[in-house]
């Protein structure tokens, strides 16, 4: 670790009788100038550069550029950042470990040492993405779901156990433990990290990157971290720095306090709306202001969690007394807490009252103005005041008559028994039967109510509010509506401990919010099947129904393929909507139902007071954290019973449908081909705005008649055992077939028709996008995707780039790109190109039937260089337009030339 240290900043600090060495920011300021007004998040970056200064990847000029940020409040300087550790979840972690295993195989084949492929920084992988809500509203739901999860995912879990044994610095948190970001917040994160080297203990800020976009949650603990693609995380593990531009930093000033009855969820939805409107993509957001003095750590974590939804790289909170209080509450050693305080104060990383750093730009929110809110129907930034939800739904519905639909097999349906009868499509309603009773399902029905996601289940105030509201509802005699699939899936076992201690578990159970698992569940689309008669009723009457969840994303089709509108809400509002059964009820004015005394019961009658919530929170104690995290890496007997081979290289199974040897490194021993212009390319799809990584590479159900479904059936897998796309990310054959296969994706080449199809232009046939891509590959035709604004928004899903690469796509031309997906495209050797301002696919009249040549790649490739696209139209006419090459840094140029970032890293080791 000892750096070049050209500024002579290495100092020592004694804390509790132990000496720590560190690279001093105050000492650096003697040479670089006053750093007092530098944003805290940039001070963390500056310390990172001081510690890693080597004269080549980090130079004295980099240090000066970061310190000089204060002059212009922005910089175009590229720096090399090295986080202390890497965090993964299993959906992104499995393909990452598959890549590492494939790199070891390639290394062995080339005559090298496979052991060279090893994480150099600590990597924690938390298995949280696989549990599904198959069973619900019963005392045995949790045990049954765990059993099903282990049956479905045994092969994947055995592979991860192999990885845990085969790789150094690689730990796995077994299934049924919690959600990675909540485990990170409550246990893994330290705020100040230490490392023993050369007989010294070095102290430095805890920093990380994660293979999940909500890695930002840890920013609430004063830990700088954000999501990157799995590809970039793998490179970071192997010692490659994260290449980044010194960011703009937007200051968000918080003042005042939340009013009675207003939750942290209402606050984060307001912050998300404000920042999306401001435009903070690719920027840091840092929170400051006197409002932080009364903002609990859990509320800070909730706000930091949703940085991807407001578009920022991170949402950083500085260290203060509240940080120390949370570290103590969550059971961190007192020695850690004392080090955090001493180090933060010594380095100028401690929040002082009244201190205001200099920012690129600022926003201000008086928290006293926040109102009760949800976000929906299909974007997290679309905040809707509680009293306006019904009208927002009606507006979405368009008040139009929905024709009856009888395509019963249109979407994958799983689940129990029963039939749907009595369709009345003109009024958007239908009767269905279940358990011998007839119920009427209408447009706006809440069919899923899920207390889910680390965003909110990490926050005792909103969780206790949900439990207290449930208690009052039961005491009033209210019940959830029979068509509501209700579930409780916290991000940590501590939550169920404090519910039990507060005496609230039985009330949640009585309303159907029984524990279904410790994992992401509904928030990531693992909502499981609805009851079969309900699924059939929705399809027969073509109903527009709703989910209400305490999650962070609500893109159309994400939560469940049959649920078109999804509403983000606080946990107590999730319970309230389960009681109401519809989003077409104004909960501010209309009753939730009728009590056992025959009187209407309103939301205000059962909403808990801040005093009641505060009293309940007193039940949360440190011993709960100690108990639940004492054996966090051990797992249950099912996990421990998994048999795994002891070998440095993985023994690939040819008949496996979960884990396959990917083709990415087949020719790694050969020199990469020179970069050349793209000639005679065809357009694979023309897509609109806000195309998400869910659209590009879905995580949910696999349709039986899709290319991926056909592949699985051909390999002996029954549709009931398909599992999900997310669970099969270790098999490139499934994933490339699933690329652009989302049932909600709209291809303008087919008039905006929904579904993963396209026009195969040479013959005029409509084909699945995968099938068309394979035809083009047979012809030797390169492919291009054309899209609108915010291409690749959403999850940090590396398969959205990997699948694009395997389909033969050479370039994506869009109006703008979301940060992580742009980086992932470059990391997989796919060229991101941006239309010039004022131009787009519509103004250029691009239909997708054109032949395209991309010119300017043959010379010296540079970041942000202009390129030309030549167009030959269907009638033979020709023209051209300019695009901006969105390879943003010199490092990315080198990665692109090598065919991708992992190819670059692997070749450097051969």
Curated annotation (Swiss-Prot):
EC id: 4.2.1.3, 4.2.1.99
Binding site for [4Fe-4S] cluster: 454, 520, 523
Record-annotated membrane-spanning stretches: none
Keyword match Endoplasmic reticulum: no
CDD domains per the UniProt record, alphabetical: AcnA_IRP, AcnA_IRP_Swivel
Cofactor binding description: Binds 1 [4Fe-4S] cluster per subunit.
Cofactor(s) needed for function: [4Fe-4S] cluster
Quaternary structure annotation from Swiss-Prot or TrEMBL: Monomer.
Protein name: Aconitate hydratase A
Organism lineage: Bacteria, Pseudomonadati, Pseudomonadota, Gammaproteobacteria, Pseudomonadales
């Amino acid at each position: 670790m000892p750096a070049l240290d050209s500024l002579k900043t290495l100092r020592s600090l004694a804390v509790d009788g132990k000496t720590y060495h560190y690279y001093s920011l105050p000492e650096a300021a003697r040479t670089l100038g006053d750093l007092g007004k530098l944003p805290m998040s940039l001070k963390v970056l500056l310390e990172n550069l001081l510690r890693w200064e080597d004269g080549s990847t980090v130079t004295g000029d980099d240090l000066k550029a970061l310190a000089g940020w204060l002059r212009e409040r922005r910089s175009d300087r590229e720096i090399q950042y090295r986080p202390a550790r890497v965090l993964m979840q299993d959906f992104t972690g499995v393909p990452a470990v598959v890549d590492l295993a494939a790199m070891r195989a390639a290394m062995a084949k080339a005559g090298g040492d496979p052991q060279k492929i090893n994480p150099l920084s600590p990597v924690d992988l938390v298995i949280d993405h696989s549990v599904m809500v198959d069973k619900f509203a019963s005392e045995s739901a949790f045990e049954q779901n765990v059993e099903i999860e282990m049956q479905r995912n045994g092969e994947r879990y055995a592979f991860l156990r192999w990885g845990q044994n085969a790789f150094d610095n690689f730990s796995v948190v077994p299934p049924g433990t919690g959600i990675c970001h909540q485990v990170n917040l409550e246990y893994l994160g330290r705020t100040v990290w230490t490392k023993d080297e050369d007989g010294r203990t070095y102290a430095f800020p805890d920093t990380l990157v994660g293979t999940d976009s909500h890695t930002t949650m840890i920013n609430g603990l004063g830990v700088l971290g954000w999501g990157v693609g799995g590809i970039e995380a793998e490179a970071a593990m192997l010692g490659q720095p994260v290449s980044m531009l010194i960011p703009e930093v937007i200051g968000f000033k918080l003042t005042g306090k939340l009013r009675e009855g207003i939750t942290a969820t209402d606050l984060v939805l307001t912050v998300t709306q404000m920042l999306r409107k401001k435009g903070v993509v690719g920027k840091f957001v840092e929170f400051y202001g006197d409002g932080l003095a009364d903002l609990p750590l859990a509320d800070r974590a909730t706000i930091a969690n949703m940085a991807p939804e407001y578009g920022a790289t991170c949402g950083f909170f500085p260290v203060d007394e509240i940080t120390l209080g949370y570290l103590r509450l969550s059971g961190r050693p007192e020695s850690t807490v004392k080090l955090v305080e001493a180090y933060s104060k010594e380095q100028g990383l401690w929040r002082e009252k009244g201190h205001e750093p200099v920012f690129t730009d600022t926003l201000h929110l008086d928290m006293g103005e926040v109102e009760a809110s949800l976000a929906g129907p299909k974007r997290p930034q679309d905040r809707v005041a509680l009293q306006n939800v019904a009208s927002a739904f009606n507006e979405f519905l368009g008040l139009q008559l929905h024709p009856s639909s009888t395509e019963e097999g249109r979407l994958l349906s799983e689940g129990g028994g029963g039939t749907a009868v009595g369709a009345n499509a003109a009024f958007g309603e239908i009767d269905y039967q279940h358990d011998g009773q007839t119920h009427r399902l209408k447009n706006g029905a809440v069919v899923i109510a899920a207390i889910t996601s680390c965003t909110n289940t990490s926050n005792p105030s909103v969780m206790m509010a949900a439990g207290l509201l449930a208690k009052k509802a039961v005491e009033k005699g209210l019940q959830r509506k029979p068509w509501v699939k209700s579930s409780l899936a916290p991000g940590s076992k501590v939550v169920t401990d404090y519910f039990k201690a507060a005496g609230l578990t039985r009330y949640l159970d009585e309303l159907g919010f029984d524990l279904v698992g410790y994992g992401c569940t509904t928030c990531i689309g693992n909502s499981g099947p609805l009851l079969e008669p309900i699924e059939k009723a929705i399809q027969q009457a073509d109903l527009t129904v709703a989910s209400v969840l305490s999650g962070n994303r609500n893109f159309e089709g994400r939560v469940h393929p049959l649920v078109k509108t999804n509403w983000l809400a606080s946990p107590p509002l999730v319970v309230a909507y389960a009681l109401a059964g519809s989003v077409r009820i104004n909960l501010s004015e209309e009753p939730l139902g009728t009590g056992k005394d025959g009187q209407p019961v309103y939301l205000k009658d059962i909403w808990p007071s801040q005093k009641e919530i505060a009293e309940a929170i007193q039940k949360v104690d440190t011993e709960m954290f100690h108990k639940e995290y004492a054996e966090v890496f051990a797992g249950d007997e099912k996990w421990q019973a998994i048999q795994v081979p002891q070998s440095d290289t993985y023994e690939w199974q040819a008949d496996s449908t979960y884990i396959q040897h990917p083709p990415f490194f087949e020719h790694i021993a050969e020199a990469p081909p020179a970069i050349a212009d793209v000639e005679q390319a065809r357009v694979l799809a023309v897509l609109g705005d806000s195309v998400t990584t869910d659209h590009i590479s879905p995580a949910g159900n696999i349709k039986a008649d899709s290319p991926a479904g056909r592949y699985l059936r051909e390999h002996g897998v029954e549709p009931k055992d398909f599992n999900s796309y997310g669970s099969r990310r270790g098999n490139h054959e499934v994933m490339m077939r699933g690329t652009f296969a989302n049932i909600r994706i709209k291809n303008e080449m087919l008039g905006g028709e929904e579904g993963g199809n396209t026009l195969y232009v040479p013959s005029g046939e409509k084909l699945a996008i995968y099938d068309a891509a394979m035809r083009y590959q047979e012809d030797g035709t390169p492919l291009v995707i054309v899209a609108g604004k915010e291409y690749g928004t959403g999850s940090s899903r590396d398969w959205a780039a990997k699948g694009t690469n395997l389909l033969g796509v050479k370039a994506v031309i869009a109006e703008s790109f979301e940060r992580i997906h742009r980086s992932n495209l470059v990391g997989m050797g796919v060229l991101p190109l941006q239309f010039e301002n004022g131009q787009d696919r519509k103004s250029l009249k691009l239909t997708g039937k054109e032949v395209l040549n991309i010119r300017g790649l043959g010379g010296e490739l540079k970041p942000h260089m202009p390129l030309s696209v030549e167009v030959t139209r269907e009638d033979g006419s020709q023209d051209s337009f300019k695009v901006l090459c969105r390879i943003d840094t010199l490092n990315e140029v080198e990665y692109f030339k090598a065919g991708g970032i992992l190819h670059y890293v692997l070749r450097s080791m051969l």
